[in-house]
From Swiss-Prot:
Family membership noted in the UniProt record: Belongs to the transferase hexapeptide repeat family.
A Pfam family that the UniProt record links to this protein: Hexapep_2
Name of the protein: 2,3,4,5-tetrahydropyridine-2,6-dicarboxylate N-succinyltransferase
Enzyme nomenclature, EC number: 2.3.1.117
GO biological process: diaminopimelate biosynthetic process; lysine biosynthetic process via diaminopimelate
Keywords: Acyltransferase, Amino-acid biosynthesis, Cytoplasm, Diaminopimelate biosynthesis, Lysine biosynthesis, Repeat, Transferase
Naturally occurring in which organism (per UniProt): Paraburkholderia phytofirmans (strain DSM 17436 / LMG 22146 / PsJN)
Length: 275
């Protein structure tokens, strides 16, 4: 079924200039709607780990983008205090008490998740925003004013602290999604964007900014890398001097690495304060 969906969506993507809310073949509408439904249920994912490596299903990103071409804006009620006007309805627009009970997650007002995002059991959504295509796995916390961008992948038992920004990647299409693996802590007001991967059991301190051009300096080895935080890293904001010594530029500093047992036993503040 997925291969057939992919073929229809890939073909529709090549002919996307011809598509509009008033002009689209029925099979394309059905394929896109089905793909969004599967994303919403967590049965399909924009990215998944296979044999230790993350693989991006680009056709599902195409399906999300096509859905914007196929839908008109429409008024959406907001509980009597306002209205919205958009193409993508709320994930919870038609939820019943039974649906919420079956989902097993908490949604604290006025948290918003768009249809096509997946929220797993024991997730807590504080007043926050989760965009279409995102996947938030079991036991994670999306804290107040945090944003989970389009197609971002959040692992199990992750804590996204207040005001954290996890970037979205619908455009440009070739960009990979941001991935936060299991058991990570992302400190308040930090930003992770442009397809950066934070590997499991890592701790990102408050106010750390990570993009593909951000230098990641490992103080134990002196190595500078980009785009990936190794498993078990404790990361703080820092600066590196220029070659001529006239100025310094922002970087992220890996101050230490810890294993899962240490991460579980030692408090976050102790990890971040330790030498």
């Amino acid at each position: 079924m997925s291969q057939q969906l992919q073929q229809i969506i890939d073909t529709a993507w090549e002919n996307r200039a011809e598509l509009s809310p008033k002009a689209a073949p029925a099979d394309v509408r059905e394929a896109v709607a089905h793909a969004i439904e599967q994303l919403d249920k967590g049965l399909l994912r924009v990215a998944e780990k296979k044999d230790g490596d993350w693989v991006v299903n680009q056709w599902l990103k195409k399906a999300v983008l096509l859905s914007f071409r196929l839908e008109d804006n429409a008024p959406m009620p907001a509980g009597g205090y306002s209205q919205f006007y958009d193409k993508v309805p709320s994930k919870f627009a038609n939820y019943t008490a039974e649906d919420f009970a079956a989902g097993g997650f908490r949604v604290v007002p006025p948290a918003i998740a768009r249809r096509g995002s997946f929220i797993a059991k024991n997730v807590v959504l504080m007043p926050s925003y989760t965009n279409i295509g995102a996947y938030v796995d079991e036991g994670s916390m999306v804290d107040t004013w945090a944003t989970v961008g389009s197609c971002a992948q959040i692992g199990k038992n992750v804590h996204l602290s207040g005001g954290v920004g996890i970037g979205g990647v619908l455009e440009p299409l070739q960009a990979n999604p941001v991935i936060i693996e299991d058991n990570c802590f992302i400190g308040a007001r930090s930003e992770v964007v442009e397809g950066v991967i934070v590997e499991e059991n890592s701790v990102i301190s408050m106010g750390v900014y990570l993009g593909q051009s951000t230098k990641i300096y490992d103080r134990e080895t002196g190595e500078v890398t980009y785009g990936r935080i190794p498993a078990g890293s404790v990361v703080v904001a820092g600066n590196l001097p220029s070659k001529d010594g006239t100025h310094s530029l922002y970087c992220a500093v890996i101050v230490k690495k810890v294993d899962a047992k240490t991460r579980a036993k030692v408090g976050l503040n102790e990890l971040l304060r330790g030498d």
